[in-house]
C-alpha cells in the first residue's frame, strides 16, 4: 500500500522554491542563447556562453531528478535492491559528471580509490544504484552551493565493520545495523557552516538563518534516501574549522574476490 505524502505549508514553500529556481535557470539559458545568436561571429563569446548554458542545464536536470526522489520519499517503492555495481565506478562517474560544474567555481578535486587495501572486495549494495548516484550527487550540489571559490574536495572510500567497538563508541552509532558496511568519505574545505544550521541540516528541507532562506533540499534528500535503507550520514569537522567531512555509510554484502 502506498503511503500518503501530505503537503503542508513548509512543503508548499519548498515546491515554490524549486519552481522558481527552474524558471530562473530557463530564463538564464534563454538569455545566453539570444546572446550567442547576436554574437555569432565571436567564437570566444560563444564558447563562454555555451559553458554557462551547459552548467545551467546540468543543474536543471539534477534538480528535477532530486525533486522526483523527494516527492516519492514516503512511498513503498523505496525497497532494498541488490546490485553488483562497483562503488568505485559509480563515484568516479558522479565525479566526472560534476567536474565541469565544480571547476567552474575553481574547486579542486582529488580522488582516492583506496588502492592500498590489502584485500579487494566486491561490494553488493543493499541500495539501488540510482539512489546511490542521486544521494552522492545531492551532496556534491550541497557542497557546490556552500563551498567558496578556490575550495578543495577530496573523495575516498573504505570498508568498515560495525563490530569494531571503538568505531561505534567514537561515532555514537547503533550496532543493530548490518555488520558489513561501506563508508564513503567526501572531504571539502569551506568557511565555517554556522553550528545552528549544521544541527538542523537533516531535520528540515527549508531553513531560515539570519533572515536568509537556506535551501538544503539536496542534503536533506540524500539523508532520507540513505537512512531509509538502514544507512547513515553525518558531518565531521576535521583538522580545523575550515575543513568538513561527509561520512556516508551504505549497507552492503562484502564478497572476497
Q: What are the language-model segments listed below?
A:
Residues 226-227:
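Detector for a conserved hydrophobic position within an alpha-helical segment of the HATPase_c
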Residues 101-116:
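Short conserved segments within the C-terminal catalytic ATPase subdomain
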Residues 75-80, 120-127:
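Conserved micro-motifs of the catalytic ATP-binding
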Residues 218, 222:
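Short alpha-helical Gxxx[C/S/T] motif in the catalytic ATP-binding
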Residues 179-181, 193-206:
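Short conserved segment of the HATPase_c
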Residues 55-63:
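Short alpha-helical segment of the dimerization/phosphotransfer core of two-component systems
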Residues 150-165, 174-178:
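Short beta-strand/loop element within the Bergerat-fold HATPase_c
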Amino acid at each position: 500500500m502506498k503511503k500518503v505524502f501530505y503537503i503542508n505549508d513548509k512543503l508548499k514553500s519548498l515546491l515554490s522554491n524549486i519552481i522558481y529556481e527552474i524558471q530562473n535557470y530557463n530564463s538564464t539559458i534563454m538569455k545566453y542563447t539570444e546572446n550567442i545568436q547576436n554574437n555569432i561571429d565571436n567564437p570566444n563569446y560563444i564558447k563562454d556562453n555555451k559553458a554557462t548554458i551547459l552548467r545551467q542545464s546540468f543543474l536543471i536536470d539534477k534538480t528535477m531528478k532530486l525533486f522526483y526522489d523527494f516527492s516519492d520519499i514516503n512511498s513503498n517503492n523505496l525497497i532494498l535492491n541488490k546490485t553488483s555495481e562497483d562503488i568505485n565506478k559509480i563515484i568516479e562517474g558522479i565525479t566526472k559528471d560534476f567536474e565541469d560544474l565544480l571547476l567552474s567555481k575553481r574547486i579542486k578535486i582529488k580522488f582516492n580509490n583506496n588502492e592500498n587495501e590489502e584485500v579487494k572486495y566486491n561490494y553488493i549494495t543493499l541500495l539501488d544504484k540510482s539512489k546511490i548516484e542521486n544521494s552522492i550527487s545531492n551532496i556534491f550540489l550541497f557542497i557546490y552551493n556552500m563551498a567558496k571559490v578556490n575550495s578543495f574536495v577530496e573523495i575516498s572510500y573504505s570498508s568498515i565493520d560495525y563490530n569494531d567497538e571503538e568505531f561505534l563508541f567514537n561515532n555514537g552509532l547503533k550496532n543493530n545495523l548490518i555488520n558489513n558496511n561501506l563508508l564513503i568519505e567526501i572531504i571539502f574545505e569551506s568557511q565555517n557552516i554556522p553550528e545552528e544550521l549544521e544541527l538542523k541540516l537533516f531535520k528540515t528541507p527549508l531553513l531560515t538563518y539570519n533572515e536568509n532562506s537556506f535551501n538544503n533540499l539536496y542534503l536533506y534528500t540524500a539523508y532520507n534516501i540513505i537512512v531509509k535503507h538502514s544507512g547513515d550520514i553525518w558531518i565531521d569537522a576535521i583538522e580545523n574549522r575550515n575543513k568538513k567531512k561527509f561520512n556516508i555509510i551504505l549497507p552492503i554484502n562484502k564478497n572476497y574476490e
